[in-house]
Protein backbone atom coordinates (compact mmCIF):
# COMPACT_ATOMS: atom_id res chain seq x y z
CA UNK A 1 0.00 0.00 0.00
CA UNK A 2 2.81 2.42 0.77
CA UNK A 3 5.70 2.97 -1.62
CA UNK A 4 8.55 3.03 0.93
CA UNK A 5 7.14 0.07 2.85
CA UNK A 6 6.86 -1.87 -0.40
CA UNK A 7 10.40 -1.02 -1.47
CA UNK A 8 11.73 -2.27 1.87
CA UNK A 9 9.88 -5.56 1.41
CA UNK A 10 10.90 -5.90 -2.24
CA UNK A 11 14.64 -5.76 -1.58
CA UNK A 12 15.07 -9.27 -0.12
CA UNK A 13 12.97 -10.70 -2.95
CA UNK A 14 14.99 -9.15 -5.77
CA UNK A 15 15.64 -11.61 -8.55
CA UNK A 16 12.49 -13.64 -8.01
CA UNK A 17 9.93 -13.68 -10.84
CA UNK A 18 7.37 -11.54 -9.01
CA UNK A 19 4.97 -8.94 -10.33
CA UNK A 20 4.66 -5.87 -8.08
CA UNK A 21 1.41 -3.93 -7.73
CA UNK A 22 1.01 -0.57 -5.99
CA UNK A 23 -2.55 -0.36 -4.70
CA UNK A 24 -2.13 2.54 -2.30
CA UNK A 25 -1.91 6.29 -2.70
CA UNK A 26 0.71 7.64 -5.06
CA UNK A 27 2.26 11.02 -4.33
CA UNK A 28 4.03 12.91 -7.11
CA UNK A 29 7.35 12.71 -5.23
CA UNK A 30 7.22 8.88 -5.26
CA UNK A 31 6.62 8.38 -8.98
CA UNK A 32 10.25 7.68 -9.89
CA UNK A 33 10.54 4.75 -7.48
CA UNK A 34 7.22 3.37 -8.71
CA UNK A 35 8.13 3.81 -12.38
CA UNK A 36 11.43 2.01 -11.84
CA UNK A 37 10.32 -0.85 -9.57
CA UNK A 38 6.64 -1.71 -10.02
CA UNK A 39 4.74 -3.57 -12.72
CA UNK A 40 1.28 -2.16 -11.92
CA UNK A 41 -0.14 1.02 -10.41
CA UNK A 42 -3.80 0.83 -9.37
CA UNK A 43 -4.25 4.42 -8.21
CA UNK A 44 -3.60 6.85 -11.05
CA UNK A 45 -6.11 9.68 -10.71
CA UNK A 46 -4.32 12.65 -12.28
CA UNK A 47 -2.76 13.26 -15.67
CA UNK A 48 0.25 14.88 -13.97
CA UNK A 49 1.03 11.64 -12.13
CA UNK A 50 0.57 9.59 -15.31
CA UNK A 51 2.95 11.84 -17.23
CA UNK A 52 5.59 11.63 -14.48
CA UNK A 53 5.33 7.83 -14.43
CA UNK A 54 5.69 7.71 -18.21
CA UNK A 55 8.69 10.06 -18.25
CA UNK A 56 10.40 8.15 -15.44
CA UNK A 57 9.79 4.60 -16.71
CA UNK A 58 13.24 3.31 -17.75
CA UNK A 59 13.78 2.59 -21.44
CA UNK A 60 13.79 -1.12 -22.10
CA UNK A 61 11.28 -1.95 -19.37
CA UNK A 62 7.84 -3.22 -20.30
CA UNK A 63 5.17 -0.53 -20.17
CA UNK A 64 3.83 0.14 -16.68
CA UNK A 65 0.33 -1.30 -16.27
CA UNK A 66 -2.07 1.38 -15.05
CA UNK A 67 -5.55 1.42 -13.55
CA UNK A 68 -7.46 4.69 -13.33
CA UNK A 69 -8.76 5.20 -9.80
CA UNK A 70 -12.42 6.23 -9.86
CA UNK A 71 -13.98 8.13 -6.96
CA UNK A 72 -17.01 5.88 -6.61
CA UNK A 73 -18.62 7.73 -3.72
CA UNK A 74 -18.37 11.28 -5.04
CA UNK A 75 -16.95 12.40 -1.69
CA UNK A 76 -14.41 15.21 -2.10
CA UNK A 77 -12.27 13.69 0.66
CA UNK A 78 -11.78 10.45 -1.31
CA UNK A 79 -9.12 9.81 -3.93
CA UNK A 80 -9.94 9.15 -7.54
CA UNK A 81 -11.27 10.90 -10.58
CA UNK A 82 -14.98 11.62 -10.95
CA UNK A 83 -16.78 9.11 -13.21
CA UNK A 84 -17.56 11.87 -15.73
CA UNK A 85 -13.82 12.59 -16.09
CA UNK A 86 -12.58 9.02 -16.46
CA UNK A 87 -12.71 8.91 -20.27
CA UNK A 88 -10.55 12.03 -20.61
CA UNK A 89 -7.93 10.69 -18.20
CA UNK A 90 -8.02 7.28 -19.89
CA UNK A 91 -7.36 8.92 -23.27
CA UNK A 92 -4.41 10.87 -21.85
CA UNK A 93 -2.90 7.71 -20.32
CA UNK A 94 -3.49 5.65 -23.46
CA UNK A 95 -1.44 8.19 -25.42
CA UNK A 96 1.65 7.67 -23.23
CA UNK A 97 3.88 5.00 -24.75
CA UNK A 98 5.57 3.78 -21.58
CA UNK A 99 2.24 3.21 -19.84
CA UNK A 100 -0.34 0.55 -20.64
CA UNK A 101 -3.87 1.45 -19.62
CA UNK A 102 -5.43 -1.76 -18.31
CA UNK A 103 -8.62 -0.66 -16.61
CA UNK A 104 -10.36 0.94 -13.68
CA UNK A 105 -10.08 0.64 -9.91
CA UNK A 106 -12.58 1.89 -7.36
CA UNK A 107 -13.13 1.50 -3.64
CA UNK A 108 -16.81 2.00 -2.89
CA UNK A 109 -17.51 3.25 0.61
CA UNK A 110 -18.03 0.57 3.30
CA UNK A 111 -21.57 -0.77 3.12
CA UNK A 112 -22.11 0.71 -0.36
CA UNK A 113 -25.20 -0.53 -2.14
CA UNK A 114 -24.69 -3.04 -4.93
CA UNK A 115 -25.85 -0.33 -7.34
CA UNK A 116 -22.59 1.55 -6.67
CA UNK A 117 -20.63 -1.48 -7.86
CA UNK A 118 -22.88 -1.84 -10.91
CA UNK A 119 -22.32 1.84 -11.82
CA UNK A 120 -18.56 1.36 -11.92
CA UNK A 121 -19.00 -1.93 -13.79
CA UNK A 122 -21.12 -0.14 -16.40
CA UNK A 123 -18.50 2.61 -16.75
CA UNK A 124 -15.86 -0.07 -17.33
CA UNK A 125 -18.01 -1.71 -20.01
CA UNK A 126 -18.58 1.66 -21.71
CA UNK A 127 -14.82 2.28 -21.97
CA UNK A 128 -13.68 -1.28 -22.56
CA UNK A 129 -13.93 -1.30 -26.34
CA UNK A 130 -12.52 2.18 -26.88
CA UNK A 131 -9.42 1.61 -24.77
CA UNK A 132 -9.00 -2.19 -24.81
CA UNK A 133 -9.48 -2.43 -21.04
CA UNK A 134 -9.24 -5.88 -19.45
CA UNK A 135 -9.10 -5.21 -15.70
CA UNK A 136 -11.80 -3.98 -13.35
CA UNK A 137 -10.58 -3.83 -9.77
CA UNK A 138 -13.50 -3.47 -7.40
CA UNK A 139 -14.02 -4.80 -3.96
CA UNK A 140 -12.07 -5.91 -0.97
CA UNK A 141 -12.42 -8.66 1.61
CA UNK A 142 -15.74 -7.39 2.99
CA UNK A 143 -17.53 -6.77 -0.31
CA UNK A 144 -15.93 -9.09 -2.84
CA UNK A 145 -19.20 -10.86 -3.68
CA UNK A 146 -20.87 -7.60 -4.78
CA UNK A 147 -17.74 -6.65 -6.71
CA UNK A 148 -17.56 -9.94 -8.58
CA UNK A 149 -21.27 -9.74 -9.38
CA UNK A 150 -20.61 -6.30 -10.92
CA UNK A 151 -17.86 -7.70 -13.16
CA UNK A 152 -14.71 -7.20 -11.11
CA UNK A 153 -11.78 -9.16 -12.51
CA UNK A 154 -9.46 -8.32 -9.62
CA UNK A 155 -10.40 -8.09 -5.93
CA UNK A 156 -8.15 -6.95 -3.11
CA UNK A 157 -8.55 -9.54 -0.37
CA UNK A 158 -5.43 -9.09 1.73
CA UNK A 159 -7.36 -8.76 4.98
CA UNK A 160 -9.19 -12.03 4.33
CA UNK A 161 -5.85 -13.77 3.73
CA UNK A 162 -3.46 -12.02 6.12
CA UNK A 163 -5.74 -10.44 8.72
CA UNK A 164 -5.98 -6.80 9.75
CA UNK A 165 -2.99 -4.63 8.93
CA UNK A 166 -0.89 -3.65 11.94
CA UNK A 167 -0.38 0.07 12.37
CA UNK A 168 3.26 1.11 12.20
CA UNK A 169 4.12 3.52 15.03
CA UNK A 170 6.69 6.27 14.57
CA UNK A 171 9.74 5.83 16.79
CA UNK A 172 9.77 9.53 17.66
Task: Give the label of every model feature segment.
Residues 153-154:
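Divalent-metal-activated hydrolytic enzyme cores
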Amino acid sequence: NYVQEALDKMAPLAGLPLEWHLVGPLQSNKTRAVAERFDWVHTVDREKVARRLAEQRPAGMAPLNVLVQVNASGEASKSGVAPAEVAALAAAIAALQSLRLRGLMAIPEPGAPRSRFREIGALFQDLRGEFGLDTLSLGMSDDMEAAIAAGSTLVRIGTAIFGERRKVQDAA
